[in-house]
Amino acid sequence: MELIATAIIIGLGALGAGIGNGLIVNGTVLGQARQPELKNELRQTMFIGIGLVEALPIIGVAVGFLLLNS
C-alpha cells in the first residue's frame, strides 16, 4: 500500500509541477511579447517562480520516501 501511495504522491507532484511551470513560462513569454524592454525582469521573476513550483515535488519525493521506509 505504501508503494502505491508513494507513486501517487510523486506522480501527482510531477504533474502539478509540469502544469505550473508551463503556466509560468507561458505568462513570461506573453509578457516579453508585450513589453520586450522588461525581458530581464520578467526572466528573473520567472526563475523565482519556477524554483518555488519545483520545491513542492521535491518535498513530495521526500514524503514518499518517508512513507516507503516507515
UniProtKB/Swiss-Prot annotation:
It is a multi-pass membrane protein. The record marks 54 as: Reversibly protonated during proton transport. This is ATP synthase subunit c. F-type ATPases have 2 components, F(1) - the catalytic core - and F(0) - the membrane proton channel. F(1) has five subunits: alpha(3), beta(3), gamma(1), delta(1), epsilon(1). F(0) has three main subunits: a(1), b(2) and c(10-14). The alpha and beta chains form an alternating ring which encloses part of the gamma chain. F(1) is attached to F(0) by a central stalk formed by the gamma and epsilon chains, while a peripheral stalk is formed by the delta and b chains. Its main location: membrane. One of its GO terms (cellular component) is proton-transporting ATP synthase complex. InterPro entries: ATP_synth_csu_bac/chlpt (IPR005953), ATP_synth_F0_csu (IPR000454), ATP_synth_F0_csu_DDCD_BS (IPR020537), ATP_synth_F0_csu_sf (IPR038662), ATPase_proteolipid_c-like_dom (IPR002379), F/V-ATP_Csub_sf (IPR035921). Disulfide bonds: none annotated. NCBIfam families: ATP_synt_c, PRK06876.1. It is found in: Cell membrane. The chain crosses the membrane at residues 4-24, 47-67. Belongs to the ATPase C chain family. Keywords: ATP synthesis, Cell membrane, CF(0), Hydrogen ion transport, Ion transport, Lipid-binding, Membrane, Transmembrane, Transmembrane helix, Transport. F(1)F(0) ATP synthase produces ATP from ADP in the presence of a proton or sodium gradient. F-type ATPases consist of two structural domains, F(1) containing the extramembraneous catalytic core and F(0) containing the membrane proton channel, linked together by a central stalk and a peripheral stalk. During catalysis, ATP synthesis in the catalytic domain of F(1) is coupled via a rotary mechanism of the central stalk subunits to proton translocation. GO terms for molecular function: lipid binding; proton-transporting ATP synthase activity, rotational mechanism. It comes from Exiguobacterium sibiricum (strain DSM 17290 / CCUG 55495 / CIP 109462 / JCM 13490 / 255-15). CDD domains: ATP-synt_Fo_c_ATPE.
